[in-house]
């Protein structure tokens, strides 16, 4: 599935 922009942001902040 295609991850939404919010999901990508959360993953980036999680780093």
UniProtKB/Swiss-Prot annotation:
| Descriptive protein name | Juvenile hormone esterase
Q: What is the lineage of its organism?
A: Eukaryota, Metazoa, Ecdysozoa, Arthropoda, Hexapoda
Which reaction does this chain catalyze?
Answer: juvenile hormone I + H2O = juvenile hormone I carboxylate + methanol + H(+); juvenile hormone III + H2O = juvenile hormone III carboxylate + methanol + H(+)
Function, as annotated, reads: JH esterase plays a crucial role in the decrease of JH activity in lepidopteran insects, by hydrolyzing the methyl ester of JH. It is also involved in the transport of JH.
Q: Which family does it belong to?
A: Belongs to the type-B carboxylesterase/lipase family.
List GO molecular-function terms, semicolon-separated: juvenile-hormone esterase activity
Q: What is its EC number?
A: 3.1.1.59
| Protein keywords | Hydrolase, Serine esterase
Keyword Iron-sulfur present in the record's keywords: the answer is no
Top enzyme category: hydrolase
Keyword check for Hydrolase, yes or no.
yes
């Amino acid at each position: 599935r295609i991850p939404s922009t919010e999901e990508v942001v959360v993953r980036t902040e999680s780093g």
